[in-house]
């Protein structure tokens, strides 16, 4: 099957915070050096942020370095953390407040912000496009491309127009090859292509096993008078 191809200097797989920040920083460096650079971000979601479900307590040091003027650029960081209260639930009906002296520094969030990570990604995408990054939402990277020496040379996106029976429909369209001198895999936890790369290049050798957790998101409607009274347990 013949697929159309596009060539870039850097192909970034994943339009989450790490992929978008990578693309932005690369273009910033290129512009500082007056160098030509082509960067593409391919994202499986129908739009940037569509697959970002996380609410987030956001520490800003990375954003401070990437966009020092973010406070004047309408970044979606509007709700600063006012205080921390941590409770330990010892049973279904009992618990107690943990004294501050026993709370590690890393668990204090003064100066951080309560944000929607999806909205932050949308904002980062707008900054990336302003830096001339190409962003392709709605295209899932499904295959890693290798050259004759086994070196990664980009990715291919999924074919479209495949029926439930696996047969091609009239609307069939072959995926695209996005070829890059460098490919950055920023798929997040247990990304399909990332797992292939880990296995192919034996990246787990002499490494501790990874730990994974499942996050559950709840949206509560509360009395506006209580909107600041949030405790982490």
Language-model segments: residues:
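Beta1/beta-strand and adjacent pyrophosphate-binding region of the FAD-binding site
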Residues: 4-18, 40
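Glycine-rich FAD pyrophosphate-binding loop
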Residues: 27-51
């Amino acid at each position: 099957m013949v697929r159309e191809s596009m060539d870039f200097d850097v192909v970034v797989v994943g339009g989450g915070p790490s992929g978008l920040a990578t693309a932005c920083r690369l273009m910033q460096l290129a512009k500082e050096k007056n160098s030509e650079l082509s960067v593409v971000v391919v994202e499986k979601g129908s739009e940037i942020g569509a697959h970002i479900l996380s609410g987030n307590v956001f520490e800003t040091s990375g954003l401070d370095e990437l966009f020092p003027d973010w406070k004047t650029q309408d970044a979606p960081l509007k709700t600063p953390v006012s205080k921390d209260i941590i409770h330990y639930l010892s049973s279904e009906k009992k618990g107690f407040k943990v004294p501050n002296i026993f709370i590690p520094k890393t668990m204090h969030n003064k100066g951080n912000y309560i944000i929607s990570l999806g909205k932050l990604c949308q904002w980062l995408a707008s900054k990336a496009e302003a830096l001339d990054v190409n962003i392709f939402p709605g295209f899932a990277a499904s295959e890693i491309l290798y050259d004759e020496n086994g070196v990664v040379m980009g990715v291919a996106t999924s074919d479209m127009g495949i029926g439930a029976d696996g047969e091609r429909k009239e609307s069939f369209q072959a995926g695209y090859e996005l070829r890059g001198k460098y490919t950055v895999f920023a798929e997040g936890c247990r990304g399909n292509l990332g797992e292939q790369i880990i296995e192919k290049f034996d990246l787990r050798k002499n490494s501790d096993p990874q730990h994974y957790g499942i996050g559950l998101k709840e949206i509560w409607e509360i009395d506006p008078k209580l909107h600041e009274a949030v405790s982490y347990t």
